[in-house]
Amino acid sequence: LQIEAKAWLDCNPEHLWIFDKLIISRLSGHICGPRGIPVPKPGEYFVKPIVNIEGMGEKARKVYVEKSTLELLHPGEFWCEVFEGEHLSIDYTKYEPTLKVIGTKHEERPYQRFTRWDKTEKWHPLPQFIGLIPLQYKTINCEFIGGKLIEIHLRGNPDFAHGNMSVIPVWKDEPDPKPDGYRFISDEGTYVERAGIYVK
């Protein structure tokens, strides 16, 4: 079972709002809204599903919007201001950061396809609105872009559970990079687009 699906099934029903990325964005103070709410001014906005159990940035994209969002977004999607900067994925245990990794992208690749992830010492604190939820789960994971919170997960980052310092994703429709000194771990039966990861 995909790790996010297991987290959804196992969580306290009162905490299901954590899976709602629009609620997280709104609570974080971001400029955002669901399909049907017009954008405040013309420009590029980030669009993605409100809930995405599959992960991997499925259907996430930048869209230029003049005003109305009805024609450009599908039901179940939301828009948000665009953030720039470092993409950090941080695991917390009882509010303390226990795993901190930074993603590297290539500008010519799709938004959701990272070139690699590496451990780092950089991190951000958990948002205050999360309250006592971290006390009820073994690990909480948060993702930030440029210091702005974009997602919360009621589980840890599975890609760094192998004693590794770095991860290189392998995508099914792209050439296998076969990096020297890394070992391959298959994603078979887990992710649709990703074939697996190289770890070191």
Predicted segments — roles?
Residues Q2-F129:
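Active-site nucleotide/adenylate-binding loops and adjacent lid/helix of ATP-dependent enzymes
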